[in-house]
Amino acid sequence: MTDRIRLNEGNRRWWTLAAMCFALFMIMLDNTVVNVALPSIQRDLGASLSGLEWTVNVYTLTFAVLLVTGGRLGDILGRRRMFLFGVVVFALSSAAIGFAPGQGWLVAGRAIQGIGAAFMMPATLSIITVTFPPEERGKAIGTWAGEIGRASCRERV
């Protein structure tokens, strides 16, 4: 019975890692994937050049500015709570971006998406750190970090 429980805990750890890696993949992919859509955004929304620049940069700006705050709030309020909050903000803003009627809405949605990412990313690493025992932690964090490279390659396709 004890071995079976340990097996289930092991499976749960790897499913947790998969979820955290997926979240990180989405965060990193959204960092630059919008570059591919810039001609369509300009054509369909009538975006100006400065609007296109803001569309690209506002996500990174809000993400970078709030990343440490997201980590600290995760320490204070709980990593799981901050992760779920970040997922909700990220998902809702992604939907809003998809239905953006104009350039201003698109930029605002990308800013809010960056906020969601800033709350999610530190929580992903923190959750992995507490989920895995020390002897498996390096492999788990290496897998997590590999998602950054995978997302960077994927965004150009």
Describe these PLM feature segments.
Residues 2-156:
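Transmembrane-helix bundle of Major Facilitator Superfamily
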